[in-house]
């Protein structure tokens, strides 16, 4: 499992994919989302601008990514 720590209220799917090193650039995101199944909280999404909030979970190619904030760390 990978965690993405954010300090803002939300992050977009595009930003999350870049921060987790799944894609290298914003231009690659559109193609990646079109060609790969991405689940956000169990639902397939194709919206690169989808807002992700702390506690949201992404599943991409059997890799789990969780959005967190400092408040969620124990």
Predicted regions and their residues:
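A basic, amphipathic helix-loop patch mediating RNA/tRNA/ribosome contacts
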Residues: 8-54
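Glutamate identity and glutamate-enriched acidic tracts
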Residues: 3, 36-37, 57, 73
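C-terminal structural segments of small proteins and small subunits
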Residues: 47-74
């Amino acid at each position: 499992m990978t965690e993405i720590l954010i300090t803002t209220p939300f992050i977009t799917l595009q930003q999350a994919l870049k921060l987790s090193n799944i894609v290298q650039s914003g231009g690659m995101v559109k193609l990646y989302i079109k060609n790969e199944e991405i689940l956000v909280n169990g639902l397939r999404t194709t919206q690169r601008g989808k807002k992700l909030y702390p506690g949201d979970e992404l599943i991409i190619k059997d890799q789990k990514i969780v959005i967190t904030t400092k408040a969620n760390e124990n």
